[in-house]
């Protein structure tokens, strides 16, 4: 048994109790703050911002838990019921984070009074570049690390991140994991864009237009959780909560870096498999890029 788990749980709930005492005049049944993200799209940045609300309301001071649709080390895809059990395990005033598919059952839960949900995503071209660096250099336990490390160069790895990887099979012929092309990887998240209860955030807006984007995040929160605290004070808390040095997977936080790494071939294959995705997400108006 991992002794760290019960210790972390005890610390978490103790801090939540202290937060409740600190903000005793505010309701105890405030909705859960849920940050949904596409992988490599600013997960920890959004986590930090949402935790900034703990300075002005009785929210937890750390993320309750993180859920991902795939197990990082094995690459095994979790069954839909696991996501629902995780969502049901969350309690009022929690702050939680997830790479969560927009399946109908999950959407029904998240788009309910129980949650204040946010969805952050990033230019998929930057995502595939970030993915190469992360898998190759930052996470040796990742299911794809050994394979990426075996490839001859960055260009080849980037090609795999765009096109995906054929499923290696077990002795029984069953695929061990799935890693389709970038458009297919994003497809299960697309329905979050259609939910008015979910605030969608371009990662780039938090880098290039942070003040306006933090105001949008705050407005979405205040629509459900009215606070007596001055708006300027809340915004200062959200801004102060951002600390890239505390992100375990932070690399550069820059936008448009794909332009430094994409060759003509990368552009061609990306347009073939994910050109429409860029249009849907608002990153391009056509394929002439």
What are these model-derived regions, one by one?
Residues 250-254, 284-289:
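Short coil/turn segments at secondary-structure boundaries
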């Amino acid at each position: 048994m991992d002794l760290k788990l019960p210790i972390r749980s005890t610390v978490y709930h103790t801090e939540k109790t202290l937060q409740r005492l600190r903000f005793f005049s505010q309701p105890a049944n405030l909705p859960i703050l849920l940050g949904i993200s596409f992988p490599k799209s600013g997960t920890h940045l959004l986590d930090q911002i949402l935790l900034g609300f703990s300075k002005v309301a009785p929210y937890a001071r750390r993320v309750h838990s993180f859920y991902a649709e795939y197990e990082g080390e094995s690459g095994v895809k979790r069954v839909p019921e696991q996501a629902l059990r995780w969502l049901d395990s969350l309690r009022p005033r929690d702050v939680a984070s997830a790479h969560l598919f927009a399946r109908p059952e999950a959407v029904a839960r998240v788009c309910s009074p129980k949650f204040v949900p946010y969805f952050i995503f990033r230019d998929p071209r930057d995502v595939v570049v970030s993915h190469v660096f992360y898998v190759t250099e930052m996470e040796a336990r990742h299911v794809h690390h050994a394979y990426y490390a075996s490839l001859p160069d960055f260009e080849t790895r980037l090609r795999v991140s765009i096109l995906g990887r054929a499923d290696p099979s077990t002795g029984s012929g069953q695929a061990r994991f799935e890693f389709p092309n970038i458009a297919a990887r994003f497809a299960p998240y697309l329905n979050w864009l259609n939910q008015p209860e979910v605030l969608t955030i371009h990662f780039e807006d938090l880098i290039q237009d942070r003040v306006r984007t933090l105001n949008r995040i705050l407005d979405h929160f205040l629509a459900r959780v009215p606070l007596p605290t001055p708006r300027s004070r809340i915004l200062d808390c959200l801004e102060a909560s951002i600390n890239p040095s505390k992100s375990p997977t932070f690399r550069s936080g820059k936008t448009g870096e794909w332009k430094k790494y994409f060759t003509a071939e990368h552009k061609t294959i990306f347009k073939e498999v994910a050109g429409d995705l860029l249009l849907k997400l608002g990153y391009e108006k056509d394929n002439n890029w």
